């Protein structure tokens, strides 16, 4: 079974996002998710890719470590990423803080902070999203949401408009087929009996549970069948705090 990071996978997004689109989701009401960030990434070998992310401070975006690149431009306040609006704020990333223990083989510690060159202006279309404390443990069974511009199907292109999908947090056993899944570091998301998921292009987007970002779209199966694996944000709160305080 082939496993791919979300920028290479297509997941069902109306509740979570990757670097593609949401599968089994619906289009969000324009600008109803003001924390969402669209990342245009220039890679070291030339080709561009894109990911999702979310604004946690006026000058910091949280995303997945596998979304790192030679340079990154962040677009805030977007709904249709092909039609520029007055709500858009395009900001350059001046520093990428990829977690020092990020492992490209296991995709453990798939989390990264992006420092923006300028602070975002908070508007009706651009806002920050709260994230959990270190010991905030969200239980299996909870319904959450993920959003993104990723693929809406395995063989479909990315979505122009922001999509969202509702996904259920699963027991860790549901992700036992992922050899490197670690319940302490990650969340298992998406009912395997449903056809909803996040996929390629949704990577880096937030898993929103009761208004709090609990997870980050990380990886899943190459056929986009749920469940998928999300980075557990609460585990990394001390590291996040350290970066924010030092910068």
From Swiss-Prot:
**SMART domains for this protein:** Tryp_SPc
Q: Which residues are glycosylated?
A: 80, 103
Record keywords, A-Z: Disulfide bond, Glycoprotein, Hydrolase, Protease, Secreted, Serine protease, Signal, Zymogen
Which residues form each disulfide bond in the chain? Answer: 51-67, 144-209, 175-188
Q: Where in the cell is it found?
A: Secreted; Cytoplasmic granule
Spell out the reaction equation it catalyses.
Preferential cleavage: Phe-|-Xaa > Tyr-|-Xaa > Trp-|-Xaa > Leu-|-Xaa
**What is stated as this protein's family in its record?**
Belongs to the peptidase S1 family. Granzyme subfamily.
What name is this protein filed under?
A: Chymase
């Amino acid at each position: 079974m082939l496993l791919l990071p979300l920028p290479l996978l297509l997941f069902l997004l109306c509740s979570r996002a990757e670097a593609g689109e949401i599968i089994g989701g619906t289009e969000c009401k324009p600008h109803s998710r003001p924390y969402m960030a669209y990342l245009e990434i220039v890679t070291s070998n030339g080709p561009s890719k894109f990911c999702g992310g979310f604004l946690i401070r006026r000058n910091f975006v949280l995303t997945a470590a596998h979304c790192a690149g030679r340079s990154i431009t962040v677009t805030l306040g977007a709904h249709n990423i092909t039609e520029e609006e007055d709500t858009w704020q395009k900001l350059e990333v001046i520093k990428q803080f990829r977690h020092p223990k990020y492992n490209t083989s296991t995709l453990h510690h798939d989390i990264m902070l992006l420092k923006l060159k300028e602070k975002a202006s908070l508007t009706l279309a651009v806002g920050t999203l709260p994230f959990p404390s270190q010991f905030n443990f969200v239980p299996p069974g909870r319904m959450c949401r993920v959003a993104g511009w990723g693929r809406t199907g395995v063989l479909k292109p990315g979505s122009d408009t922001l999509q969202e999908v509702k996904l259920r947090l699963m027991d860790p056993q549901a992700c036992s087929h992922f050899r490197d899944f670690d319940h302490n570091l990650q969340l298992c998301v998406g009912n395997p009996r449903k056809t909803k998921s996040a996929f390629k292009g949704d990577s880096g987007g937030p898993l929103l549970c009761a208004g709090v970002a609990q997870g980050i779209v990380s990886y899943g199966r190459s056929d986009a069948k749920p469940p998928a694996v999300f980075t557990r944000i609460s585990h990394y709160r001390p590291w996040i705090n350290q970066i924010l305080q030092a910068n």
